[in-house]
Amino acid sequence: MWGSHKLTEPAMNRALVSLQSYVHMAKALEVNSIKAVATAAVRLAKNGDEFIETVKRETGLDLECISGEEEARLGFLGVINTIGLKDFVIFDLGGASTEVTLVRNRQIEQSVSLPIGALTLTGTYQKGDEFTDKEYNKMIKAIRNAIEEQPWLKNTKMPLLGIGGTARNIAKMDQRKLSYPITKLHNYEIPYHRFTELLDEVRSKPLGQRKKINGLSSERAAIIIAGMSIVYELFNYVNCKTLVVGGSGLREGLFYDYYGHNYLGGNPIIPDILIHSAENVLLEMTRHELVHAKYICRLADTLFEQWWSLHKGDNALRRCLQVASLLHDIGKRVNYYSHARHGCYMLVNSNLYGMTHIEQAFRAFLVMNSHGLTPKEYKNFLYGKLLDDEQRSIGQKLSIILAIAEALDESHEQLVMNLDSRISPDEVRLIIQYPKHRDIDITKGAVEKLVKPFKKEFKRQLEIEWSPQ
C-alpha cells in the first residue's frame, strides 16, 4: 500500500462492501441523515479523491475527508465525554497518522497530526518478514524526530490516553495476562512497567508466534511492533507513568458533536459525564421506578452526610454511593428475585462514564452487599480482586447506608419527609419524620431488620424514632 502511497484495490473493495452494508441497514431503519468521514489513510493517499468519488457513485454517501486537526478534535470529544480525566495527553494511533492532543481542564490546549502510523511505518521500514535491528532503529529515529518537533509535549508528566486499535490490543493483551475480571477495555489503566514488558514480548516473537499472543488480534500482529513503538516513545517524551485506554474515539466524537450542537446549546462537552450517563441508563426505567431511584439517592446522600463521622468517606466515595443508589434496582431488568446479583454485573458493564474500573467494581460491591452477601458470595465476588481491604471495609459501611435508604422506601410511597441523626459513642439515634395520616408499618419492618447489621458494622446501637408530623 505505502510503497506507492495509494489505497489498494482489495482495501477499497473491503471498505465499499462495509459502506454498502451500512447504507442498506440505515435505509431499513429509516435513517434520514448519515455523516461519513474519512481520515488519514484517505487523506494521505494519492488516489484518495478517486476513492471518495467511487464511494459516492456506489453508495450515495458523501464521504468527507477531514483534516488532521478535525480528526484530533473529534477524537477529543469522544474521550472527554466518556473519561473522567481533566489533564492528560490523547493519542489516536491509526494506520497512517497519530493525532496527539494536550488537554488541560477538559479543554484542548494544543494538538497535532503526526505523519507516523502503525501501517505506514511498517510498510516504510520493514523490508522483509520481520524488522532487522537496523530497520527498527531507523524507524525509532523517525518516530522520535516526529515527536520531538512538538516541544509542548515534553515532560508534561500527564497520563497518556490512547484510542484506536493499537491501544485496544495493548489493553487486551495485558488483561489476558492478568486474568482480569472486567473484560471492558474503556478506562483500563496500564502502568509503564507492564507496557514495556508487553513491548519486549511482541518484539521477541516472529509474526507466526505474535499471532498466538492472547489478546492480540491476528490482523494487527503484523503492525503491532510499529504501533507499540510509537506509544513507547510518547511514554518517554511525555514522561508519564500510566497509559489509559479509551474505548470511545472519533466515531463517538462525531455523535457528541451532533448531540452537543442540537441538544446542549451548542456545547459538545458534557459538564458531568457520570451523572449524565447514569441518568441515560435510568431512561429505561418506568416513571415510578425513576421516582423511587432518585428518592433512594437523596435518602442515601442525607445519611452519608449525617453519618460522616462514622465512615469518614470523601467526595469521591459520596459520588460512588450516589450512582449505586440511583441504579440499585437496575438488575430487575433481568430478574426481580436476584436483582442485586444481576445489578452488580450490569453496573460494571453499562455505559457509565467517568469511573475507573476500581470505582465500577466498588459500586457493584455496594449494590450487591446492600442486600447482604453470604460468606461464600463475599469470597467469590467476581470483581473483588480489584478492591483492597480498606476499600472493602468502607464499602461494607456504605452498603449499610444504601440498605437503610432502600428500606426507608420499602413501600415505594416516598413517605419519609425528613431525617435527623444524633450520634454518641454508643448509639446512633435516627429520627424519621413521616405524615401522621399514613401507614408506615411496611417501612418500619424493613428498617428494623437492619438494626443488627448496623451494629455489627458501626459498633453502635441504632435507635429508630418514628416521628409523625
Residue ranges and their predicted role:
Residues 410-415, 456-460:
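Short secondary-structure junctions
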Residues 331, 445-456:
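Feature 926 captures the class I aminoacyl-tRNA synthetase adenylation module centered on the KMSKS loop
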Residues 430-447:
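A short interface-forming secondary-structure element
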Residues 32-36:
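Conserved beta-strand/loop subsegment of P-loop NTPase cores
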Residues 2-25, 39-46, 51, 59-81, ...:
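Helical "lid/coupling" subdomains associated with nucleotide-phosphate turnover
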Residues 27-30:
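Non-catalytic positions within long, well-ordered alpha-helices that form the structural scaffold/packing
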Residues 96-102:
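Acidic, divalent-metal-coordinating active-site segment for phosphoryl/phosphodiester hydrolysis
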Residues 457-469:
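A short amphipathic beta-strand at an alpha->beta junction
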